[in-house]
Amino acid sequence: MVEDPGAHCSSVRIVAVNDDDEIGELGARGERILGVALVSPFRDRPAYATTVENSVYVARAARGRGVGEALLRQLMTVAGESGFHSLIARIVGENASSIRLHEKCGFTLVGTEIEVGRKQGVWLDVVEYQYVMSTHSR
């Protein structure tokens, strides 16, 4: 286990690249990026150093192909190996595909933040999902 995994938080990033066809976003080196999964600090205080917030982004053209699940599962593995104890996902409540993805990967709904965001004049709720490494076996 890493003594202070939070110090290495920004280094946990997984990128899916496609060499076979034109699907994905064009990357800086000409590669086709299908998606990205990463972690960021959950809180700045040392007591929360082993908890991180995850984000998964999949190119529109690559959705529905298992890219998000592959990215998230690999991110979970790397985060666990890096010494993180808990992953948090904050998802806009209407993003059903991200909610399904996190539930499929073993995340549990732990709360809802009411009207914490605003987009195009509409208030948005955010649901919070959590995955605790020690209570799951992959």
Locate the predicted segments by residue.
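Acetyl-CoA-dependent GNAT
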Residues: 1-61, 72, 132-136
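Alpha-helix termination/capping residues and helix-transition junctions
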Residues: 31, 81, 121-123
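Conserved catalytic-core motifs of GNAT/GCN5-like acyltransferases
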Residues: 38, 88-91, 103, 108-125, ...
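Residue-level preference for beta-strand/loop junctions
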Residues: 50, 83, 123-125
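A structural signal for short, well-ordered beta-strand segments
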Residues: 54, 87-89, 129
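Conserved acetyl-CoA-binding loop-helix of GNAT-fold acetyltransferases
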Residues: 58, 64-81, 86, 96-104
